Amino acid sequence: MRPAFAVGLVFAGCCSNVIFLELLARTHPGCGNIVTFAQFLFIAVEGFLFEANLGRKPPAIPIRYYAIMVTMFFTVSVVNNYALNLNIAMPLHMIFRSGSLIANMILGIIILKKRYSMFKYTSIALVSAGIFICTFMSAKQVTVQTGLSDKDGFQAFAWWLLGIAALTFALLMSARMGIFQETLYRQFGKHSKEALFYNHALPLPGFIFLASDIYDHVVLFNKSELYQVPVIGVTMPVMWFYLLMNVVTQYVCIRGVFILTTECTSLTVTLVVTLRKFVSLIFSILYFQNQFTMWHWLGTSFVFIGTLMYTEVWKNLGTTKSELQKDDKKD
């Protein structure tokens, strides 16, 4: 029952989160910083109350290690959200971030000296090809935007290239953070809720450098049209409602993933998250009518088939959690 509940949280929370993020980004494309700040603040306050016990509970992992992890986590979060300001469409944003397997494999080979089977290399090649197809076709769409002069078209394409560079950097940094977390958990034990709190609480002072941009968007949000919230009947600017729902659904999504990691194998978690991304992508395309050609569909299918191949879903479908843990120990 608990794993099924967690899967429900992941699909409901994460899919809804993408919807509200796109509603925010479509109205104010530069709102990435205020969205990131709101998410960090909400999770930090919740963690301070219920995980850190109002600051009375000492951390199991030394703060100096969290400082390193937090620097990486803060950078990844800000860069990923800021990429939406750089002509990156939401579907491409989701597809590109699905390339985390590639980044993990590359850094695993370089840093941890890991070696993989030819089957896994094939699956990663498939994911890479899918991302390349989607990125290339999106580039063509940027360069042929109607109503733009040659100068404006080149400028839009240049910003798009910067957005791709930002997503690539965030992808590699996120993979490096995952390896760092893996070494910490091996040394100090798994403390996922504690890590979640410190990863969101410690970076809060860093938002001082983004205060001007955040304040500008507070003013813009205040000027948005009024919206009456169903059921409770409270009236508020619609952009604040979108932001509130984005923050709440982000928390639900993270909690669902956390429960899954404690109840299921990493294979199951990867499969659920992958399927969730696919559902979010389909909804974004259909509901928001984002441009998506047959080439995009081909690239997307490559990404998701490659991901499923990498996790060896068909091979391990009937394998129990204890058996997988035994296999992990052998490796």
Swiss-Prot record:
Q: How is this protein positioned relative to the membrane?
A: Multi-pass membrane protein
Q: A Gene Ontology MF term for this entry?
A: UDP-N-acetylglucosamine transmembrane transporter activity
Supply one GO CC term from the record. Answer: endoplasmic reticulum membrane
Extent of motif Mediates endoplasmic reticulum retention? 326-331
**Keyword hit for Phosphoprotein:** no
Asked if Signal is a keyword of the record, the answer is no
User: Where does the record place it?
Assistant: Endoplasmic reticulum membrane
Q: Which UniProt keywords apply?
A: Endoplasmic reticulum, Membrane, Sugar transport, Transmembrane, Transmembrane helix, Transport
Give me any GO biological process, just one.
Answer: regulation of gluconeogenesis
Membrane-spanning parts: 4-24, 30-50, 59-79, 92-112, 124-144, 153-173, 201-221, 229-249, 251-267, 268-288, 294-314
Q: Which Pfam families match?
A: UAA
Which chemical reaction does it catalyze?
UDP-N-acetyl-alpha-D-glucosamine(in) + UDP-alpha-D-glucuronate(out) = UDP-N-acetyl-alpha-D-glucosamine(out) + UDP-alpha-D-glucuronate(in); UDP-alpha-D-xylose(in) + UDP-alpha-D-glucuronate(out) = UDP-alpha-D-xylose(out) + UDP-alpha-D-glucuronate(in)
Cited function = Antiporter that transports nucleotide sugars across the endoplasmic reticulum (ER) membrane in exchange for another nucleotide sugar. May couple UDP-alpha-D-glucuronate (UDP-GlcA) or UDP-alpha-D-xylose (UDP-Xyl) efflux to UDP-alpha-D-glucuronate (UDP-GlcA) influx into the ER lumen, which in turn stimulates glucuronidation and excretion of endobiotics and xenobiotics.
Q: Per the similarity annotation, which family is this?
A: Belongs to the nucleotide-sugar transporter family. SLC35B subfamily.
Q: What is this protein called?
A: Nucleotide sugar transporter SLC35B4
Q: What is the species listed in this Swiss-Prot or TrEMBL entry?
A: Mus musculus
